[in-house]
Amino acid sequence: MESKVRGEEERQKVERLVEKLKVHNNNNNRSSTPAHISFVPNSIVVSSRKLAAAFWEFHQYHYKDEEDCSYSYLSSASAKMHRGPNGFAGASSRRQRHGKAVAVKENGLDLSQFLRDPSPDHQPDSAGSLRRQIGQMLIKHHQSIDRNNHALQPVSPASYGSSLEVTTYNKAVTPSSSLEFRGRPSREPHYNLKTSTELLKVLNRIWSLEEQHVSNISLIKALKTEVAHSRVRIKELLRYQQADRHELDSVVKQLAEEKLLSKNKEVERMSSAVQSVRKALEDERKLRKRSESLHRKMARELSEVKSSLSNCVKELERGSKSNKMMELLCDEFAKGIKSYEEEIHGLKKKNLDKDWAGRGGGDQLVLHIAESWLDERMQMRLEGGDTLNGKNRSVLDKLEVEIETFLQEKRNEIPRNRRNSLESVPFNTLSAPPRDVDCEEDSGGSDSNCFELKKPAESYGDETKKPNQHNKDGSIDEKPKSPSSFQVNFEDQMAWALSSNGKKKTTRAIEDEEEEEDVKPENSNNNKKPENECATTNKNDVMGEMIRTHRRLLSETREIDEASCNFPSSRRQASPVRQWISRTVAPDLLGPSEIAIAHGVKDNTLKTKLANSSKSRLRLFKG
């Protein structure tokens, strides 16, 4: 029972000590790093087996001692320990224990001293000295335990949960307390000394176990402190690791961002390069299209220029050919004019000087132009020049004044010839149409009379003033004019009609002038006889109607020729003798009066004679 009570008290004491250590650990928050277990010098490993065997022996001896020993023996033994015969043994033993305790504190726990029996040298001399020594040792032991409890601070309450089980010990013996052994009387002194020795041995074991427990607790506390320090270090390392991990994550993230940025920059650079290349290709395609369009346009223009050049070359060739043809034609005309002049000169020698007296100036001018042309052409042939190198222009320049003079003279001569030709027609002397025999004779001699030109106006005036000659018997002798005179007058009218195209007169104006001119002879012949007037009027009407009809036909043909001039030169290259082709009157173009007259006149009429005279003139120019 007492052992149980003591065990409970020891547990309560241990719990109070644990609470004190908790409070002290909570108040002391500073970190301390105790020495590692490897730094404890002369550390002795104690097996739990030996401890258990020692505890078992102690308990067996303790219970046996309680049964066999008496209280008197214990009291006598304690008295001997207090008294001591000499008093030196207790001091020496106390010094030995103190030195042993110091050695335990300095060198660690030595269980071999407690597990083997002590030598006989260390046994106490007397019981009093032993008692005093035990009391001092207990006091020092408790003080050392208290100091160790205050010095060693456990980290956690689990520090007391050691695997080593320490046996409970009784309450420490103090010097004030006396060992009271009651019950049995003391026995033999030798036995008491042996009991004291055994008790001292037990106490030494208990103290050694307590010191071992304290050292184990300190070791456990050191280990737990080391564990705590390790935990702190681990936490710090974990914190460092976490910081390093965060830094590594940030570095990885930064690297990823930089990689993404570099990739984006590369993509942008590639896209910009592709865009620039695409733009360059677009510009190149536009330029190529434009160049192709320009090439097509230039090719088209070149083809047009080539075609125009070929046309110009063809035109030049045609112009050169036409110039050559015109030159040849002009040469032929000049030769014809010269031969015509020679023939006219031969005709002048046949008593026709009076008929050609008024027409010598114009013929001389034409002859002069023809001779000048032939001379220039001959000079060009001698020099070996071409007609396209400007020599022809020089000929035209040289003959320009003479040609203009000739044309002006012709323009001035046409109205005068026209008036003289109209006045030269003896309309009043015509009394009746000629007979058939006379017509045949006149038609036979018309070839020679067709070349007669108009006579001076004075001769025609004399004839008109004296149309009727009186015979000796007083009768009027009417001299009918021959058809040759009518032929000459009609040829003069035709020449005037042909030359009137240069002045661009209309047919209506010409008809009005003819009517006015027809009125003048009528007014001048009002004093004639009525019968003569009727005959003359009928003849004049027939002649005027024929002239007007012929003029109308000529004007229509000239309009057709002028319209044909608008066509290309290749289509209007007419024959050089076209002007001398006879123009016959179509029946549908004649009026009713002309048709009636035509039916009443035979083939040997004036129209037939005019046609024959035109043919003879053509033969003359060709021959």
From Swiss-Prot:
Coiled coil: 256-351
Intrachain S-S bonds: none
Basic and acidic residues bias locations: 452-481
Keyword RNA-binding: no
Signal peptide start-end: none
Top-rank taxon, per record: Eukaryota
Compositional bias of kind Polar residues: 422-431
UniProt keyword Nuclease, yes or no: no
Region feature (Disordered): 417-485, 497-536
Entry keyword set: Coiled coil
Cellular component GO terms, alphabetical: chloroplast
InterPro entries per the UniProt record, alphabetical: BLT-like
Name of the featured protein: Uncharacterized protein At5g41620
